[in-house]
Amino acid sequence: IVIRKESYRKFEADKFSLLEEVKQVNIGNARSASLSIGLGLNTATYAQSYNYARVAIDLALARGGDQAVVKDCHGITYFGGKKEQTSKNTRVKARVKAEALREFIVAKDQVIIMGHKIADADCLGACMGIYRAAKELEKKAHIVMNEVTSSVRPLYDEIAESPAYEKDIFLTSEQAMDYINDNTMVVVVDTNKPQMTECPELLKKTKTIAVLDHHRQSSVGIENAVLSYIEPYSSSSCEMVAEVLQYIVDDIRFPNVEADCLYAGIMIDTQNFMNRTGVRTFEAAAFLRR
């Protein structure tokens, strides 16, 4: 759809009120309708405007929909997106992403996992889940963690001091840069912003990067990822990883401390299952309790 600039200015002036108006449409539908809009502006050609619009609509959908995203040569602007995310019960997407992740891991000799800086329980839990997947597929695995906060210290110490784990399960950024090679895959969890990761430099050292995150897609994302699983509907990254694990390895079993890490991540991010909790959240928790 091509619109005049003056029409866009009207939409901009009323903050894309159309997004709210469409929710009032009721023709017997059980759920309220929502709208996602992507616009490309201020370019030299229609083709470039179209490309900007495609990027904008993809970004709007990745962030959960119900919003307008406008991209031009100066940057990206967001409108709307106030609707609380509702869980999708289908597991098709999780299964497809899990199978793809498995294939990428199998193709490499080593997996380096990292989350965001100043890791919380959800970040550590998701890291441990991917670590377990890599180990079950008989791959070397390491987790990048520079600063250990008090919120994850007990679990971190239990893992680091356990003889069941390698001494180099946890690496600093400097150590990770020494470990990485051409046969290394990097998996980023609980963030999709490159500068928020524990070691942004790692992202430039490998061509095989996977991203799993429950936060809305950032306008400055990890562009060279071969696999991106961004699910704003999930309560936590631990919920996503717990679900993915069930498709990567059949009848997977892992130590209690790893289950505790994943369960703690879900508990903290949902505030004891009080917020942003759906059917799949409880199913992930039940899987971990088993």
Model-derived regions, located:
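C-di-GMP signaling machinery
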Residues: 47, 72-108
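Anionic-ligand anchoring segments at beta-strand to alpha-helix junctions in alpha/beta enzyme folds, i.e.
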Residues: 108, 112-182
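A short glycine-enriched loop-to-beta-strand structural element that forms part of the catalytic core
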Residues: 1-2, 28-54, 67-72
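Short beta-strand->loop micro-motif that forms the acidic, two-metal-ion catalytic signature
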Residues: 1-9
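Short, solvent-exposed amphipathic alpha-helical segments in soluble enzyme
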Residues: 54-55, 128-133, 160, 202-205, ...
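A structured phosphate/pyrophosphate-recognition subdomain
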Residues: 95-98, 105-119, 126-139, 219-290
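Active-site cofactor/cluster-binding pocket
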Residues: 169-224
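Catalytic-core segments of nucleotide cyclases and related cyclic-nucleotide turnover enzymes
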Residues: 12-23, 42-65
